[in-house]
């Protein structure tokens, strides 16, 4: 809500109807530093700011592939967004947007879940059209658990495993898997990694 309010919108809540309402005559560009690099928060601010009057600057913006593709689509529709793929987005408001066609990215959480499922069950799987270049460290994180993750074009092949061995460092210690904002590991896959690591 805070980012949209900084653009000039007013929120109200009616407890009797349990309803939030938002109102704004005209949104105006603003500077904002987000408390957290929220994907949903950044996306909502971005969609509002492209039609706001003037310049909006978002520091600590989320930069996950989801935001990159949203920004690319909005730019093709006539928006003026710069800094795509970084944590600093600058949006010059435009009067209107036009139409476009867009193909959405495969869901990286689904791709990671399928890799984990194949590893847990010792199954052979080929995952088609994974958007491999936008998976970040997901494939390498599974490889560090000893899982063979083969890239074949935009597909991923995980062959049958009877067992797998977690990599150790030169001193014999084992790795730590932790979530982090993009390009780090998405927290949505930690439960999958936890189960895979215990098999």
Feature roles, as predicted:
Residues 1-199:
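Structural preference for solvent-exposed beta-strand-turn elements
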